[in-house]
């Protein structure tokens, strides 16, 4: 009796494929469990108990805008046309990108409410985040990959992965973009980049990374083909911004709707001095502006200024990712395409909010530095274990700020 062909022997069975999903599934469950415990130890802004398993516990100011886009599309108007006592600035929801709310709209077609659909999109994206990270780490359980997944469950700012925000969806898209670069699939990389740019302005970092990919990816191709793949994937990714602009124009009649509301209502226009913005972000008085009512639990009381520790941790994480990349480059004389991509994206995600002037929202945008875990997976356990401990403490503090309504 002849043996089966090698292609059959090498093909993973259904049981093997399911087994490969167990570590990311476990990470997703642990992330929800940890976040629920933090919510249980916190209070809502009105002093009531946090209902983590309800949609109300996952909504913040921006979530209302994303839901409004999912329900009725874009709108822009002079505030005083509707609110007589309001400053004469522009109101509406054109300051928010469509990738996430359009996904929510698609899921709501199943009959689920928009609120539940929003949570489904966020949680499904979070599971996808762990699954793609697991693939990028080699899909083999070791102490290094296990610790990396553990860090991912308490990643800085990761509480927003569970919220009605595009952070999880945008992060998944960036990881898919990195996976496309690793596989040599410019189409997959372009698709991930498109979704990332359609979810949030920070996602535009994918365009820059894909342009640079000609120098570190597509290595089996000639230089001319590498340049074409890099340029084509970056162009497709940039179409996420064009789609956003087109949707806003269709609803408002203005191609500059996003820029107009940012400048009129939020004073954000042009490029800022990043170090000045870091200083403003560090000193922003969240605890004075948004203090929960009534008696505060210990965790909430000690978390009202947690964004300051968050900035230190985020800066340390960027330095760790860059240092790991440099060590691997010196030792091995090369980096994998996915490692180059992850390093570039991590640094860019850290800097973009400060160039844009996002002093009230940088901490959630920085959660997309999750892509840097691709490199952290190669770090020593003497680095990974302290990082896990630091991230765990900071995750609890920032999570408590979120559930208490201190963060927006």
Name every feature range the model reports, one short phrase each.
Residues 31-45, 207-216, 220-324, 338-343:
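Membrane-lumen/periplasm interface segments of specific transmembrane helices
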Residues 61-112, 353:
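Short hydrophobic/aromatic helix or loop-helix immediately within or flanking a transmembrane segment
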Residues 88, 94-98, 102, 110-128, ...:
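Loop-to-helix entry region of an early transmembrane alpha helix in multi-pass inner-membrane enzymes
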Residues 105-106, 117-140, 320-324:
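Transmembrane-helix motifs of polytopic, lipid-linked glycan transferases
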Residues 116-117, 133-154, 172, 337-344:
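Transmembrane-helix signature of polytopic, membrane-embedded enzymes
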Residues 124-125, 147-176, 196-212, 362-368:
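Multi-pass, polyprenyl lipid-linked donor-dependent membrane glycosyltransferases
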Residues 177-188, 220, 379-380:
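Membrane-interface transmembrane helices that cradle and orient dolichyl/undecaprenyl
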Residues 333-356:
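Transmembrane alpha-helix segments characteristic
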């Amino acid at each position: 009796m002849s043996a089966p062909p090698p292609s059959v022997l090498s093909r993973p069975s259904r049981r093997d494929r399911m087994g490969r999903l167990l570590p990311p599934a476990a990470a997703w469950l642990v992330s929800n469990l940890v976040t629920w415990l933090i919510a249980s130890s916190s209070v809502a802004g009105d002093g009531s108990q946090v209902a983590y398993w309800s949609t109300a516990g996952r909504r913040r100011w921006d979530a209302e805008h994303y839901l409004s886009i999912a329900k009725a599309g874009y709108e822009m108007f002079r505030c005083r046309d509707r609110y007589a006592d309001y400053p004469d600035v522009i109101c509406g929801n054109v300051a928010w990108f469509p990738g996430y709310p359009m996904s929510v709209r698609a899921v709501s077609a199943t009959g689920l409410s928009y609120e539940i659909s929003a949570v489904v999109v966020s949680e499904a994206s979070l599971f996808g985040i762990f699954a793609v990270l697991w693939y990028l780490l080699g899909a083999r359980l070791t102490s290094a990959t296990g610790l990396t997944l553990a860090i991912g469950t308490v990643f800085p700012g990761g509480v927003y992965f569970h919220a009605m925000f595009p952070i999880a969806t945008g992060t998944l898209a960036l990881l898919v973009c990195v996976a496309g670069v690793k596989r040599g699939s410019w189409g997959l990389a372009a698709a991930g980049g498109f979704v990332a740019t359609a979810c949030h302005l920070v996602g535009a970092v994918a365009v820059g990374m894909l342009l640079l990919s000609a120098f570190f990816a597509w290595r089996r191709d000639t230089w001319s083909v590498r340049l074409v793949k890099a340029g084509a994937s970056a162009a497709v990714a940039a179409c996420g911004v064009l789609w956003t602009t087109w949707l806003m124009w269709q609803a408002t009649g203005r191609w500059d709707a996003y820029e107009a509301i940012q400048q009129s209502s939020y004073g954000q226009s042009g490029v800022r001095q990043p170090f000045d913005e870091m200083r403003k972000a560090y000193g922003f008085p969240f605890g004075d502006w948004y203090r929960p009512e009534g008696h505060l639990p210990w965790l909430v009381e000690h978390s009202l200024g947690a964004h300051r520790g968050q900035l230190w941790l985020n800066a340390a994480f960027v330095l760790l990712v860059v240092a790991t990349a440099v060590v691997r480059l010196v030792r091995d004389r090369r980096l994998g395409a996915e490692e180059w991509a992850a390093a570039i994206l991590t640094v860019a995600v850290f800097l973009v909010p400060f160039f844009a002037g996002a002093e009230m929202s940088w901490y959630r945008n920085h959660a997309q530095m999750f892509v840097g875990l691709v490199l952290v997976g190669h770090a020593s356990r003497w680095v990974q274990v302290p990082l896990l401990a630091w991230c765990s403490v900071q995750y609890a503090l920032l999570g408590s700020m979120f559930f208490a309504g201190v963060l927006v």
